[in-house]
């Protein structure tokens, strides 16, 4: 049941992916961008790439970010019959339903987002976007 609910919620929050406009698709795209930039001696290149991003996203922060997206979207009710509170609670259920079997034992992942949920990639991308936006807001990058 949690998987089907996660698929439903994923379809509802997928439009927020459009908020992410600073994503480099591959190393060739990065090379093309960096080839056209003059980096001064007192400047640095920063990479926000994260290993194992999905399993390192804190659930509470992810819920806050999605809630903010939903709250600021005046058209979210057109995509979903659930209200803001209901969508958030369903998402929380999906993110906290992290049972898995290891060596015959049943375990629950205590923190962070599970890899196998349909909502996980969207939630991880929005979390990273929020983190990057916060970091960049405190500086004035030459390229972003």
Ranges and model annotations:
Residues 1-26:
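Non-catalytic interaction regions
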